[in-house]
């Protein structure tokens, strides 16, 4: 529940930031992400605003980007991850209480949501459909090199002393 609230808050902040900055002449928006994920719908809203922004949004994974946070990260115009960070993509999770028909409705809704999320990963990364299906079945944290290979990011940021 706490993660869902956090990602919902972050999603709303992104919407506000992109809307505000779209009215300005800023050269780029630099979005730094460290999130355990949360509500898929909020992640989709944030991703939509990133994609619709007139100003390019550069994403930076610092620490972690999991679940809904990866949706926002992978749609950035330029996508970065720091060398000590990880990303996690996985199936959505849900719960339902009620009649058999409530369960049937929830399954139909979740199938539709999963299809939409898969479409975003397939469009904005190098991940192939079968590979994506296999990845989504697991809860594996992907290191920066694997994220680069899969096309979740474009660059690994290395730390260097000054």
Task: Enumerate the language-model features and the residues they cover.
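Terminal-region recognition feature
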Residues: 1-162
């Amino acid at each position: 529940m706490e993660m869902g609230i956090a990602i919902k808050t972050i999603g709303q902040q992104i919407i506000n930031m992109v809307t505000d900055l779209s009215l300005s002449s800023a050269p780029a928006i630099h979005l730094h992400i460290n999130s355990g994920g949360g509500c898929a719908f909020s992640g989709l809203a944030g991703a939509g605003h990133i994609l619709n922004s007139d100003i390019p949004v550069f994403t930076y994974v610092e620490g972690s980007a999991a679940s809904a946070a990866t949706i926002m990260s992978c749609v950035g115009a330029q996508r970065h991850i720091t060398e000590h960070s990880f990303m996690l993509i996985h199936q959505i999770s849900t719960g339902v209480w009620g009649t058999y028909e409530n369960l049937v409705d929830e399954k139909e809704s979740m199938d539709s949501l999963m299809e939409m999320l898969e479409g975003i990963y397939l469009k904005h990364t190098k991940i192939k459909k079968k590979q994506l299906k296999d990845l989504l079945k697991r809860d594996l944290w992907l290191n920066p090199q694997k994220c680069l290979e899969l096309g979740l990011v474009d660059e690994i940021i290395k730390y260097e002393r000054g």
